[in-house]
């Protein structure tokens, strides 16, 4: 099952109520870090400050869904088994994944990259790699399409398109856990000693161990596409400009963004929040003001990450 397009991600801002402003860049902070945003039609953008963005050649025309930095390597995944790697985020190389399934989620911990994806073959796709170059297929404990994967408390946790959860200590052998929703879970994060995941119908669940889960929000106003834990704050983003924040993952505050666009992904770095979404939209925030940035593209952007 193909991943539902842009259910708008979860994230941004952790402090005060956000106001919306559109302005040109007047100043930026020099940083050795790098933001990488990925999207449709092989789109790859980079920025050192989150405000000025440069298009990079991915070598792929497939939709790119997610990216992660680990083991001194950027790894980006996408449709039809696409896996791209880069040492600097600028120059990218296509790798052989061994699958033609669409790949949606990726993480890196315990010296292991874990990638998850579609299920047209009858089982959700799980791939692992030590270096991002050579990949091995693993057996999923579910036939559902797999959407996201995270790591915390010595445990990998993945979520699927039917509200299912699986966990693993090594990323290789997986155990199915009780389904926590009937809707797809598109985004998740680990922080403050707990996992937090959000569904396409706006439900938010938490767990300390990846096995037992609590429903902390029955349903928010909008579908949520992404959740991160950065700057000591959980942030979830989604459709209709939705941004929700929480310090503990349990009590959430809906921010007034003044924006109606769909947000798909969010990250924090260089003392700034960066949010990406449909139509090439990129917004940044210092925690108080949400500012529209020029991306140079009109295609949907799915995720954004920051490497220090």
Residue spans of the language-model regions?
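Bacterial Sec-dependent N-terminal signal peptides
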Residues: 2-4, 13-34
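Residue-level hotspots at or immediately adjacent to binding/recognition sites across diverse folds
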Residues: 25-308
């Amino acid at each position: 099952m193909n991943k539902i397009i842009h259910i708008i991600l979860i994230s941004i801002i952790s402090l005060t109520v956000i106001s919306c402003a559109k302005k040109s860049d007047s100043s930026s902070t020099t940083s050795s870090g790098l933001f990488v945003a990925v999207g449709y039609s092989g789109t790859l953008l980079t920025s050192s400050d989150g405000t000025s963005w440069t298009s990079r050649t991915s070598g792929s025309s497939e939709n790119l869904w997610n990216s992660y930095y680990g083991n001194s390597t950027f790894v980006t995944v996408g449709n039809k088994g696409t896996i791209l790697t880069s040492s600097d985020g600028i120059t990218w190389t296509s790798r052989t994944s061994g699958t033609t399934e669409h790949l949606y989620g990726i993480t890196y911990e315990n010296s292991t990259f874990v990638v998850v994806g579609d299920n047209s073959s009858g089982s959700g796709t799980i791939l692992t790699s030590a270096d991002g170059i050579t990949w091995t297929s693993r057996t999923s404990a579910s036939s559902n399409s797999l959407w996201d994967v995270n790591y915390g408390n010595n445990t990998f946790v993945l979520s699927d398109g039917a509200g299912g959860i699986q966990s693993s200590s090594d990323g290789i052998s997986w155990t199915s856990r009780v389904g926590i929703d009937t809707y797809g879970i598109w985004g998740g994060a680990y922080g403050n000693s707990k996992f937090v995941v959000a569904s396409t119908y706006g439900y938010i669940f938490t767990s300390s161990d990846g096995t037992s889960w609590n429903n902390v929000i029955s349903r928010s106003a909008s579908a949520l596409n992404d959740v991160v834990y950065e700057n000591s704050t959980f942030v979830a983003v989604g459709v209709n400009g939705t941004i929700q924040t929480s310090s503990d993952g349990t009590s959430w505050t809906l921010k007034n963004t003044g924006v109606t666009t769909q947000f798909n992904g969010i990250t924090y770095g260089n003392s700034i929040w960066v949010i990406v979404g449909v139509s090439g939209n990129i917004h940044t925030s210092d925690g108080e003001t949400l500012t529209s940035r020029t991306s140079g593209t009109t295609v949907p952007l799915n995720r954004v990450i920051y490497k220090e």
